[in-house]
Structure formats: structure tokens, C-alpha cells
Amino acid sequence: MKRLSSAAIREQFLRFFEERGHVRVPSSSLIPGNDPTLLFTNSGMVQFKDTFLGLEQRPYTRATTAQKCLRVSGKHNDLEEVGPSPRHHTFFEMLGNFSFGDYFKAEAIPMAWELLTKVFDLPVERLWFTVFEGDDEVPPDDEAAQLWVAAGADPERVLRFGRKDNFWVMADAGPCGPCSEITIFIGDDLKEMSAKGVNSDDPNYVEIWNNVFMQFERSTMQPLHRPSVDTGMGLERMAMVMQGVHSTYDTDLFIPLIERQLALLGADEPTYRAHVAPFRAVADHSRAVAFLIADGVLPGNTGRSYVLRRILRRAVYQGRTVGFEKPFLADVAAVVIEQMGAVYPELRERADFILETVDLEERQFLRTLSGGVSILKSVIERVRAVGGTVIPGDDAFTLKDTYGFPLDLTQKIAAEHGLTVDEAGYERRMEEQRARGRRAAQFKRAADAEAWADIDLPPTRFTGYLGVSGSGTVQALIVAGDQVAEAVAGQQVQIALDSTPFYAESGGQIGDTGVLIGPRGRARIDDVQRPVPGVIVHYGVVEEGAIAVYETVEAQVDSVRRAAIMRSHTATHLLHRALRDVLGEHAAQAGSLVAPDRLRFDFTHTRPVTPEQLREIERRVNAWIRADTPVAWQELPYQAALEAGAIALFGEKYGDVVRMVTIGCVNGNDALSPAAIAERQRAGFRMCSRELCGGTHVGRSGEIGLFRIVSESSVAAGVRRIEALTGAEAEQWVDAQIATLHNIAARVGAPPSQLGERIEALLAELKQRQRALDELHARQARSNLEGLLANVQAVGDIRFLAAQVEAPDTARLREMGDWLRDKLGSGVVVLAAVIDGKAQILAMATPDLAGRRIHAGNLVKALAPIVGGSGGGRPDMAQAGGREVAHIPDALEHVAAALAAQAGG
């Protein structure tokens, strides 16, 4: 058997099928394209699902891929098994070959045999093959069995199993069929090999390849007109076999990641062998984290984002168990990028963003971990003190709600102490919180969805791309939650038409406003929504007469407002492109608001955008506006739009046919004026934006007029926000800024051109005066403190000073204490002050006494209750605080007794 690297296995697999007429198709994203049924891509066939279902036609009938996959739950994987198990993974690569109605078993099985026995040179005597044994509904797969034997397999090595192991189903409807799996025995002694080990839990039998033969329609079990083939070979397992090891973690895919961890710790191989589980978990999770972030997922609290956060945090916690105290995961993820970036270029393209995101999330979690662990330990001690074995759900909830401590980590730490967590109680508290949130939140028109769902209406035809007015027939009316035949003057009403030019709020663009004019009345429209899919509903008030069902009304959108919205929306696309060009392709849209008076754009980026970057982004957008490039749209198949380079928004669901908005992307100069041509050449970048978008846009970029960024801020970890203005609003903002500039210039007595110099001079003067004032205050304070030294007392041979002073904050109080302690030479200083309305007590002991005869921390613990508070600290310095400032003199009176108690002890 050949010994091959993982890279060689991947390449030889793909090349083998390429040479046999297959198209090498790049891996799709870990985020399934336009498939809401899947959280992550978990097999090679996911990107071809619509092709297998007959919903999509590809320009080829044979394909081969190395597909990125992620499995974190369900039958395929349990996250807690990753690390302890020698072969479980979250992220993995699936090698596959596919036939879309082209070849079938008669060609697939001989090719599989040739690849395994000739190219990979696997020993035939170690291979086993399984086929479907048949049942009452489907006959046995004798054809596959015979083909394996014809290819060269020993008939005794071809085994038959039932549906559980050898029949594949996509869903209740669609293609299905028998599958044939190839298993290899990797044990040392061939005499111990037997058929009983196949499809068992024996680790010496490794399933390396599954060939699925789609030949039936699931709902009828009738033969398909064009049967297909879908195969999957796990690269990690194949590497394990080809490299002669018994764990995937001992292959060249994981060894560099484990070695990096050991290097960071300054540890050696025996350290790894003594703690394999956490090292392996970190190695696996670093791959999953790097690839998820590269594909656009950011850590968060819901959906895919929560899965990423959970994997990342589990890696960090596992790392802590082997000695990592500072952030380390980005260093390991860097090896993933270095190791796999050539095969998956998105890793290299987004390397900086990946590593910054990992580091930011890890540091945030370490802060959470530090606070949460100490709280959890106190809970564990409390439970154990009463002989309990279960951490109450209320405590687990408090850890999550107050400290951000995840339940799974609470469970893990509890298990390490022999305890469990009341998960039912935790879920009950979580549901109570969710219920409160639902009651408190005023979700727009939330109750309306139920009312409209009860009315059977066809989809509304939207005509607003072509104009801002048109006629439509009233299909239904709702007043006060009830369906009515007529709405009269003064009533708030919801109106559905069969067709409308009014745009319903969607994709960040707010809904239109305007009027509906009927034969007997008029309604003012204040908002437009889609409470149920496909149905556009106009929300407003009947101002005159009445509006009735089946009447034809004239729909008139507020054209001035719509034009302003279109300017904002087109500018949003230009901003998105500029962000990607300036910051990197990782700067993907994470949310937006498109309104007539402003736009807001959230995007993925880990650090503040610098002023220089903001200026360059703004420059590019305005250059694009001046170039007056055309804005066009077309409807086309989803896959065709992606192949044309259109940006599809992360997490958005698209139909089979999508609307692609193109801005610029002009190859020649035919569509541009001479001035625009010059502007485009002067700008120094290609003006081309393509996005999937259902919103409304201007006809040319020049209609935007002007673009100005007014703010840049953070909205969440790894997500930034830009707010901007366009058109007249941008001009007004610029005018206001100029007016402010002139006003400030007049106040400081300098022309606007010299304002910076004048402000610097004023600040320098202010700083000099502040320094002189501080020196004066310091002299006065020292004079006051010197006076206190006359009040030094003694308890036995211990000198002490106890006094109330005035201090603006605790920092100044400590400065006073330091000065007095140094002047005292040997002794104890106790100072008290009222700061922010509360009593603050500071105790300091000189080095000759601290920790030997006097403990400052114990001293303030004795004084704090007198002022209604608590405190503590080190032997040499401690602080306490309390609410009862009136009792400060009493606390100072008690210093002598407290010192006597310590000295006497």
C-alpha cells in the first residue's frame, strides 16, 4: 500500500475522475446556498441537491469535488465526542464523484475498484463491500454485488445489510436508492479479520467510501427515468488508512496543529500523549472556526453564529485544561490557513479577518470565563455543603443571563466535580425570559400576520419597478383585526390589492407611503408590509368617504420620498462595494436600513475603520456618483447570478429566479458621457457592483448627487456600522458642518484655514495652566497632610495615623496614603473620605509590619461594618466602602482597638 499525504490523496482522487470525464467543481460554502433546511453543508451532494431533484440543469453530467463539511449535532456527530474519540470531527473534507443521469452502477463500481486497488494500491485482502439485502418494498441489489465480484472482489467479501446501513433517502419525496459501502480492515493480524466486524463498533474496521445509487422516486418507489450516483469518501479517514495510523489526529492534517500547541506551551510529545483529548479538540475546532469565519459566519447567540461561538469557546476551555492561560487559538488557526490556504483560497484572502475575529472572541470569552468560573465554584461549594448533586437551574440561568456563561460549559465544569445541572429548570427560566421579551417587544404588525394568514389570497403583483402609480383591485380589508367589506372615513385600515406600485418593507428598504384613491373615497398610506409571504398590505387611514372590497383604486406612491429612498439604496450598494475594496472581501453586509433621509449599513469587520479608510471609502462612492454609471437589473436563475459574480447576502433566502442589480460594470464607454469617462479614469478603480436585490434603485449613479459618511461605530463583536446621507440631506449636513466650523473659528479668533493651529495653541495654554493649578493643589495637600503627622498615635510599639480627609476619588486617596506611609517610616495609616456620596476607607501598613504583625485587609474588614459596608485587600494595602458616611468618625475611633486585636494576636 502506498503512503500518501492528504494533499496527494485529494489531488489523485480529483484527477482520477477528471480523466474520466468529470468536471472538477470547487467546494461550495459551509453555508448551504439558498437551502433553509440545512444549518451547514454536511456532505458533498449538498451543492448538487437541486440538480438531483431535477430543479436545476448543470452544463455537465459528471462532477468531482473536495467539499468542505461541518457536522456538530444529530446522528452524525456529538460535539462532546470530538477530542476523546480518535476519529470524530466537526470540520472535515468529503471527496466525491457524481453522475447526474449519466453513468450508473455498471461504470461507478469498476471506477471505484480501480481507484482503490490500482491508484491507492489498497490491499484487496483487507477490503469489504456491502450492498442492500432487499426488503418487501425494494429488491436486493444483486447488480451491485455482481459488479463488485466482476471487478475482482472475493464473493465472500461482499456482504448484504438492511435499510439502516445500505439504503439512502433524501426526504419523504425525491430520489432514493441502495448504497454500497467500502470498509477496510486496519488491524495488525489478518487472522482476526471476519465479516462480523463490518458495520460494527470495532475500530479495526474503517468505512472509507460510500456509493449511493439513486434509482427510485421515494413517494412511489418507481424507478427513476435517469438514475444518478452520489459518492462520499472522508479525506481524514482515508489519510489515516494511507498513512498507517489508527487515529485521524495522527495524520498530516492534524499533526501540525498539535505541534503548534505544544510549541506555544513549550511542551513535548509525552505531554500530548498524556492529554490527547484537549489537544485534539483544539486542533479540530481551529479548523472549523477558521473555515466558518472564512465563509462569513461570525460568533453570536443564534443559529450558525451560536454554533461557531460554541465551538470556539469549547476550544478555548479545552486549551485552558492543558495550560493555556493567554489567548492562543488564533496562533493555531494561523496554521490552518497556512496548511490549507492553497486548496481553499478564501482562507488566505480573509486571513487577517479570521485571526482578528478569533482573537477578539477568545479575549472576550476569557473575561467571561474568569468571572463565571469563580461564581460557579461558589455554587458548587454551596451544593456540596448540603450534600447535593445537582446545580439548580436558577443558578445555571443566572450564570448565563448575568455573566454570559454558556450552559454547556456549566455542565462540563459541574461534571468535573461529579455534579449535574437541572437542565429542565434552566430551560424553564429561559422560556420565562423569552415570554417576557415577547410580551414587552412591540413587533410591528405582529398580530396582523395571523389575521392575513386566515385569508386565502394570491400573491400581489408588484409594479413599482416600472413606476410610482398604477391601478389595483381591492382584494381584502382589515379593520381592528377583523376582515370587513368596507372601511369608512376615520378608520385605520389594512388594504390588500391584486397589484400595486407600493414597495413593501424588505431587505432593509422601508415601505413606501402615498395614497389610494377609489371611486368613493381616499386612504392615506403610511406603511407597506408583507405580513404573510407574497401578499403586500397597505397600512393607513381612510381620510375621505369609503374604500370597499372589489373596488378599483388608483395607487399613487409619494414620488419625492421614493426617489430619496432609491438614492439611499443605490448608495448602499456602492458603499458595500467600496467597503470590500478598501477593507477586504470579508466586509460583508450584516444588516441595513434604507430610508429617505439616511442609510445605515452594518458589516463584518473586527476593528474600527480608520479615518483614512473612511475618507477613501467616501471618495470612491462619490467618484462613482460623478461617473454617472448606469444602474440595471435583470431576473435570472439563482445559480446563474452567482456565476455572474453577484453578491448574495449571508442568511438570506432566495427563490429559484432572482433579481440582480448591476451598477457600472461597463466594459466600453458607450453608456457614459465624456465627463463620466474622465471621472472613471481619474478614480483609479473598477466601478462594478452586482448584488441580488429586490429593492428599488435610481437609473444612473449620478442621480444620488452626493454621499457623506456621518458616523462609524461598533454594534456587536466583529460587526461595525456606518451611517450616511445622500442627495439634499448630505448637502444640508455639509452646510451645517461648514457653519459650525465658521462659528468655532469666530469664537477662537482665527480664520477657518488656521483653526487647527489656533486650537493647538489654546490646548497647550490650557495644559500649562492646569499643570500650574495641579502643582498648587499638591502643595496645599502636602501642607494639610504634614499637619496630620502631628496626630500620630500608638498602640504598644505600633504607631498609627487615623484621619478623615477630602479626596475627589480613590486614586487621590491612595496618593495621600502613600505619602503619609512613607513619612511615617514604620506604622499604619488609615484614611477615610466621602467620595461620590459613600464612605471610603483606606488602610496601609509599612513593609516591616505588613503580613507579620498587621494585615491591612483584615483591618478594613473590621472597620467596614461600622460604615455599613465591606472590604478587604492585601496585607500592605486594603480598601473598604460603605453607605453610612455619618459613621466615619466611629470607624476611625475603632482603629486603635482593631490594631490592638491584631498586634495582640
From Swiss-Prot:
Family stated for the protein in its record: Belongs to the class-II aminoacyl-tRNA synthetase family.
Key word S-adenosyl-L-methionine present: no
GO CC, any one term: cytosol
Catalytic activity: tRNA(Ala) + L-alanine + ATP = L-alanyl-tRNA(Ala) + AMP + diphosphate
GO MF annotations, alphabetized: alanine-tRNA ligase activity; aminoacyl-tRNA deacylase activity; ATP binding; tRNA binding; zinc ion binding
Keyword annotations from UniProtKB, A to Z: Aminoacyl-tRNA synthetase, ATP-binding, Cytoplasm, Ligase, Metal-binding, Nucleotide-binding, Protein biosynthesis, RNA-binding, tRNA-binding, Zinc
Top-level EC class as recorded in UniProt: ligase
Domain of life: Bacteria
Enzyme Commission number(s): 6.1.1.7
UniProt record, GO biological process: alanyl-tRNA aminoacylation
HAMAP family: Ala_tRNA_synth_B
InterPro entries xrefs: aa-tRNA-synth_II/BPL/LPL, Ala-tRNA-lgiase_IIc, Ala-tRNA-ligase_IIc_anticod-bd, Ala-tRNA-synth_IIc_core, Ala-tRNA-synth_IIc_N, Ala-tRNA_ligase, Ala_tRNA_ligase_euk/bac, DHHA1_dom
Name assigned to this protein: Alanine--tRNA ligase
Cofactor(s) recorded in Swiss-Prot or TrEMBL: Zn(2+)
Binding site for Zn(2+): 569, 573, 693, 697
Function: Catalyzes the attachment of alanine to tRNA(Ala) in a two-step reaction: alanine is first activated by ATP to form Ala-AMP and then transferred to the acceptor end of tRNA(Ala). Also edits incorrectly charged Ser-tRNA(Ala) and Gly-tRNA(Ala) via its editing domain.
Species, as recorded: Roseiflexus castenholzii (strain DSM 13941 / HLO8)
Domain comment, as recorded: Consists of three domains; the N-terminal catalytic domain, the editing domain and the C-terminal C-Ala domain. The editing domain removes incorrectly charged amino acids, while the C-Ala domain, along with tRNA(Ala), serves as a bridge to cooperatively bring together the editing and aminoacylation centers thus stimulating deacylation of misacylated tRNAs.
Localization per record: Cytoplasm
Main subcellular location: cytoplasm
Name of encoding gene: alaS
Cofactor note (record): Binds 1 zinc ion per subunit.
PANTHER family linked to this entry: ALANINE--TRNA LIGASE, CYTOPLASMIC, ALANYL-TRNA SYNTHETASE
Pfam families found in the cross-reference section: DHHA1 (PF02272), tRNA-synt_2c (PF01411), tRNA_SAD (PF07973)
